[in-house]
Amino acid sequence: MYDILKQPQKGEKDITDYDAFSVGLKLHSEGITAKHPVVMIPGVISTGLESWGTHKNSRQYFRKRLWGGWSMMRALVADKEEWKRHVMLDKYTGLDPPNVKLRASQGFDAADFFITGYWIWSKILENLAAIGYDPQTSYTAAYDWRLSYANMEVRDQYFTRLKMHIETAVKIEKKKVVLASHSMGGQVLFYFFHWVAHKSGGNAGESWVDENIEAWINISGCMLGTAKGLPAVLSGEMKDTAQLNAFAVAGIERFLGREERAEIFRAMPGISSMLPIGGDAVWGDMNSAPDDKPGQNVSYGAFLNFRNHNSSHAQRNMTVQQSLEYLLNTTEPWYQDMIKGSYSNGVAHTKAEVDANEDDPIKWINPLETRLPLAPNLKIYCFYGILPPFTPIKSLFTTN
């Protein structure tokens, strides 16, 4: 743990490196300046969560971050059970548990760093500032990523506030807004596009996106979910589950067992929005997968690999679709109900299905079941890393 604690010292030095602004300064020297207002939608776990509860058990944490920052690690070490009680949502309502009130941190501080030395949005903020952006022309639309998308509106009116902020920016700046989303933020934004137009949501009509949004910059958006999401809620796996640095991963893994971690992740319905979408049609089956390479012995379509502790030969593999079914068959009823009532992972095959799904909020995160907004002038830019090292097949060990 001491070695991990030393890591932020190097990060602090990196933060002050004058090259941090180099991209923005180069663009500025070429005549590039701020034009459209910018709204940033962070990804999963990257927004800090702070306590606003005043119950006697919460007063010690008042306005301290229980997710993100050093106060999170201190709280976890000092009183693990109390920390768990605060960060987990009510398993049946998906909202705040009794006498607990955690809210997303706001402003640029909400998602610039997860912990000292581990930057998330800070580099983008630095370079936006270098071409003239400031708090009047840029905004971080932080949200409580633990909530299901429907409950983001129920509890925090997140989508209503996002709509109002965009409209205000357009009115003041006389230019349409550019949206930049990361990871889960891409799904949140896709849901928002449906919500804002629908009569049961923002009721702004189909033309709203075209009238208010210049472009959407989708940075590593998990539009079809992510392979990491399933092992997280199934077994509490964290090694490549979330955007955490080595310190946070080591700290959480050291103080929380796998079962505890799985319980926590299941009690954060927002994380389950990133379960793989499209089933075997997208992710492959036992025989082949889109990302298989020539001569590969085992297809990446075999997503989960179960091995018996007592026999190296006894094993069975599961595709993504089978893995999702296994998850729902082996988890608690409250979790099954939450998943089925919040998200859809299927595929629509006809225009009639797609049109009908516009009236079903459960489908709004799924680009395989719903359409893009009716915005012919909207520009969409997608940024992804290519060929990063990864482990496509997850192994779960069992004695049964």
Which role does the model predict for each range below?
Residues 1-180, 184-258, 262-265, 272-300, ...:
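N-terminal non-catalytic accessory region
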Residues 34, 267, 373-376:
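A generic structural signal for short, non-catalytic loop/turn and secondary-structure boundary residues
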Residues 306-400:
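C-terminal subdomain of alpha/beta-hydrolase-fold enzymes, centered on the catalytic histidine
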